[in-house]
Amino acid sequence: MTVEMRLDAHPRTETGRGAMRRLRRARRVPGVVYGAGKEPQPVALENDQLYRLLEEEAFFSTILKVQMGSETEQAIVKDLQRHPFKPLVQHIDLQRVREDQPITVHVPLHVHGEEQSPGVKKGGVLHHDLLDLEVVCLPKDLPPFIDVDVSSLKVGQAVHISELTLPEGVQSAALQQGEEYDAPVVSVQATRKTRGASSDDEAESSESE
């Protein structure tokens, strides 16, 4: 179930480094709301509210309700800059969305079935090649996450983008560019333990012959 997320944004007129510093001292985050055929609108957001939402995994793959005065805009996060060591957001870009226009969003991947994987049972290590997947879809079709089943993976095998089961109306941005972009999503890699077990199996097979 997708959780509705709301952001309070205050239109601002001041720009420049000095104005940005004053905003940040007041624990506000400078940002901009743009797109959907409208003029870009500089805004200021509350850092504490924004940081609480950042704790939600689906924050970057959710249609946000951005409240600006009496108006509500629907938007997605296109860029966010964090302070290198303080719990502060330095800047945020929000792109307006329209119900009839496709959007491109990074959606988190949920991997399951590791305990059942034959490769993991033999000592292989599950390697996450991708943590999220860039997808293209209409706003109404945007999923909060995408499932990745690794329960049948053996050592040396991988699940590729083309093998994922995407919801109806959702496409991989990479595969739209061509089959050569069909990257591995997750794989089971060999370790010394699995390589040793493989050698022992081969030796036993030779002796039995």
From Swiss-Prot:
This protein's record includes keyword Ribosomal protein: yes
Keyword S-adenosyl-L-methionine: no
Region (Disordered): 175-209
GO cellular component: cytosolic large ribosomal subunit
Keywords linked to the UniProt accession: Ribonucleoprotein, Ribosomal protein, RNA-binding, rRNA-binding
Feature: compositional bias, Acidic residues: 199-209
Residue intervals passing through the bilayer: none
Superkingdom of the source species: Bacteria
GO biological-process terms attached to the record: translation
GO molecular function: 5S rRNA binding; structural constituent of ribosome
Cross-referenced Pfam families: Ribosomal_L25p (PF01386), Ribosomal_TL5_C (PF14693)
Primary role: This is one of the proteins that binds to the 5S RNA in the ribosome where it forms part of the central protuberance.
Subunit structure: Part of the 50S ribosomal subunit; part of the 5S rRNA/L5/L18/L25 subcomplex. Contacts the 5S rRNA. Binds to the 5S rRNA independently of L5 and L18.
PANTHER family: RIBOSOMAL PROTEIN L25/GLN-TRNA SYNTHETASE, ANTI-CODON-BINDING DOMAIN-CONTAINING PROTEIN (PTHR33284), RIBOSOMAL PROTEIN L25_GLN-TRNA SYNTHETASE, ANTI-CODON-BINDING DOMAIN-CONTAINING PROTEIN (PTHR33284:SF1)
Family: Belongs to the bacterial ribosomal protein bL25 family. CTC subfamily.
The protein's name: Large ribosomal subunit protein bL25
